């Protein structure tokens, strides 16, 4: 007959079974400093074993994260950030839907620094925030996060920030998050990878601005000035961009960009010119009343199975022969190419670099749909527009 014990082995009663999270982060750090880890990269502990600390609103964020690493927030309480929170080690913040309110002078609410030397815990490889709601108060217009180490945001909600929500110079992953009425949700300044999946951007000015490689997939952007300003390259797939205004109405509010050393009007999706980079992979996207700018790069720009309904495509000089729309659905699409500038008509606009630039009016010329098939010769009832199961 199995013998009852308190170690959670077979035969123990449910009341006496031990939970996995019985090791505190302080004990793990002490074990690491004692030299019992045979190797720095040895993952002796996993996420489920680390005891979580239920944080109180009056606790010091910097100290609690350094001491406990695995933090739980109370959804019935409100957590107010009055000064910058410094994070220098891997941690895991479980929000449970709790509100984190940022007040005070403009600055940085959370500053993720370069990680210090410490233990490696399985499934706690980065700074992670999950199920947190971030709000601002008292006209706070600073940044929410600046990240110098890898950070993961999972199912978080940012609302009403007039500054940049997340600025990163390291690998960044944003999954299942929502950004409502934010000026710039994501600004990626690293040469690493940016991953944004299953997110919602509503009523934002510049949703994603990236200088590095990216994978942006399965997102929804509505009523925003710019969804993606891409100076780098990567994968852009399965996204939906919906603008409730017509192209004439959206022209009343416009911004510019100087990312490619030329001041251009900022489009909903803006692929900057760079002769050293290839075009991003552009697949299975739906654009409704959106603006797409295609700069000059290496190779060709061939959107696959994208719906470009009542949208505007602007081609930079030298890129008009690089675009192929033969596998798209361009109903109501208008295509223009940049001809020259009118020096007699100058205007000043706010730039995505947060400065204001004066530029000459750009003269555009309307062109036909580039590289589309002849409907009298090429049938759409073919393998190109079908799945494997249909053949």
Curated annotation (Swiss-Prot):
GO terms for cellular component: host cell cytoplasm; host cell nucleus. GO terms for biological process: symbiont-mediated perturbation of host apoptosis; symbiont-mediated perturbation of host ubiquitin-like protein modification. It is found in: Host nucleus; Host cytoplasm. The keyword Phosphoprotein applies. The modification Phosphoserine is found at residue 387. It comes from the Viruses. Interacts with host PML-4 and PML-5; this interaction promotes efficient subnuclear targeting of E1B-55K to PML nuclear bodies. Interacts with E4-ORF3 protein. Interacts with E4-ORF6 protein. Plays a major role to prevent cellular inhibition of viral genome replication. Assembles an SCF-like E3 ubiquitin ligase complex based on the cellular proteins ELOB, ELOC, CUL5 and RBX1, in cooperation with viral E4orf6. This viral RING-type ligase ubiquitinates cellular substrates and targets them to proteasomal degradation: TP53/p53, LIG4, MRE11-RAD50-NBS1 (MRN) complex, ITGA3, DAXX and BLM. E1B-55K probably acts as the substrate-specific adapter of the SCF-like E3 ubiquitin ligase complex. This is E1B 55 kDa protein. Disulfide bonds: none annotated. GO terms for molecular function: ubiquitin-like ligase-substrate adaptor activity. Keywords: Early protein, Host cytoplasm, Host nucleus, Host-virus interaction, Modulation of host cell apoptosis by virus, Phosphoprotein. The keyword Phosphoprotein applies. InterPro entries: Adeno_E1B_55kDa, Pectin_lyas_fold, Pectin_lyase_fold/virulence. Contains a PML interaction motif that allows the subnuclear PML localization. Belongs to the adenoviridae E1B 55 kDa protein family. Its main location: host cell.
